Design a protein with these regions (language model features):
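C-terminal motif of bacterial Sec signal peptides marking the signal peptidase cleavage site
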Residues: 11-15
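Bacterial signal peptide processing site
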Residues: 17-20
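Early extracytoplasmic/lumenal segment of secretory-pathway proteins
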Residues: 29-110
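Extracytoplasmic ligand-binding site segments that recognize negatively charged/polar headgroups
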Residues: 52-61, 86, 97, 102-246
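A ligand-binding cleft/hinge motif common to bilobed small-molecule-binding domains
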Residues: 107-110, 249-267
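Periplasmic-binding protein-like
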Residues: 130, 153, 216-225, 231, ...
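A bilobed periplasmic-binding-protein/Venus flytrap-type ligand-binding module shared by bacterial periplasmic
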Residues: 158-163, 202-205, 281-296, 312
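Mature extracytoplasmic/periplasmic domains
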Residues: 288-348
Length: 373
């Protein structure tokens, strides 16, 4: 699977009306004729009054949602989460009002096993044609039966050069206790068990998706050894606290760091993929099986796959796009950065997180022990 997924990214470097019965099209405030929608809005008579979008924090330009609302006459009810596990837990707890979600690759596999995703009607998503070909045959969902790739990226280290003195291009900077002690109270880790335990496993030379009890115990001990120097576990504002100076080192998603660093204008701040490697991932648009407004969700997916919109997304998130038609409009600042579009020699060292199967319970226990000790 790793080879197939890696090929997706290497080739990137080298190189959207349905039949369900949702509520009627929005009417004018005075109860008159329906609002005239743009050609990007599907069949107006089938659009619902609103669509509920559950997304990662800071993972879309808010202007895009406003544009969709104004063009299509549909209110976007927007909510955010901080990890795939939070998303899964929310849905398993009985949340049935969400129309569109964005699970990562390994979480798609889990949700498919649990019958949690609705099959897509491709006739409502003609902009699927805008995807890079390899993103139409992902190992976790060949043919985009249930999902549409949205963005892809990496997990690495954010840093303040004034404090570190050099680019911290190794996991040693995080997991070596003697080195971490130099930055006591100034290190942040993601509040994400797959990423943090995975990074510790990588530091130790193991698979980032290991379910071996001995290897996982070693990873736990490595994290506990540096926990006294960790200021916070944060998946929402890890970039903000680097910019503010509250921390000088952190583990986080590349685009999250790039967004806040770009806004700060501080040339001493940066993001690096460790030389040992790290996580590479693909996030995907998907519709929960319980979605009340699947047609409108498909129209929103198609809207997000528009080339102009796709470029606007990446120019805001600082993540790489699965949308080939959007690439010419993505800022060179994004496409030319090796931390966003890594070179082949870096890609070879990156891993996709894979489903843990029965090992999930062990990972859950170890994460609980890490957070509670």
């Amino acid at each position: 699977m790793l080879t197939s997924l890696l090929l997706i990214v290497v080739l990137l470097i080298s190189a959207c009306g349905g039949g369900n019965t949702e509520s009627a099209a929005p009417e004018a405030a005075d109860g008159g004729e329906p609002i005239v929608t743009s050609e990007r809005c599907g069949e107006p008579s089938q659009l619902s009054d609103s669509v509920s979008f559950y997304n990662w924090t800071d993972y879309i330009d808010p202007d895009i949602l406003t544009m969709f609302e104004e063009e299509c006459g549909v209110d976007v009810i927007y909510d955010t989460y901080s990890s795939n596990e939070d998303l899964l837990a929310k849905l398993q707890a009985g949340a049935t009002g969400y129309d569109l979600i964005i699970p990562s690759d390994y979480m798609v596999s889990i949700m498919l096993q649990l019958n949690m995703l609705k099959e897509l009607d491709h006739s409502n998503i003609p902009n699927l044609a805008n995807l890079y070909p390899r993103f139409t045959e992902t190992p976790y969902d060949p043919g985009n039966v249930y999902t549409v790739p949205y963005q892809w990226g990496t997990t690495g280290i954010g840093y303040n050069l004034e404090a570190t003195g050099e680019v911290p291009d190794s996991w040693d900077w995080i997991f070596d206790p003697e080195r971490a002690a130099q930055f006591e109270g100034q290190i942040s880790l993601l509040n994400d068990q797959r990423e943090v335990i995975g990074a510790a496993l990588k530091y130790l030379g193991y698979s980032m998706s290991s379910v071996d009890p001995t290897e996982l115990e070693a990873a736990k001990q490595a994290i506990l050894a540096i926990k006294p120097y960790v200021a916070t576990f944060d998946s929402d504002s890890f970039g903000d606290i680097l910019v503010s100076g509250d921390v000088v080192l952190g583990v986080g998603w590349g685009g999250g760091y790039y967004q806040d660093i770009a806004e700060s204008g501080n040339d001493n701040l940066g993001y690096v993929i460790p030389q040992e490697g790290g996580t590479i991932w693909t996030d995907n648009l998907a519709i929960p099986a319980t979605a009340p407004n699947p047609y409108t969700a498909e129209v929103l997916i198609n809207y997000l796959l528009d080339p102009e919109i796709g470029a606007k997304i990446s120019n805001f998130t600082y993540y790489a796009s699965a949308n080939q038609a959007a690439e010419p409009m993505i800022d060179e600042e994004v496409t030319g950065d090796p931390g966003i579009y890594p070179p082949p020699e870096t890609l070879e060292k990156l891993e996709f997180l894979t489903e843990l199967g029965e090992g999930t319970l062990l990972w859950d226990r170890i994460w609980t022990e890490i957070k509670s000790e």
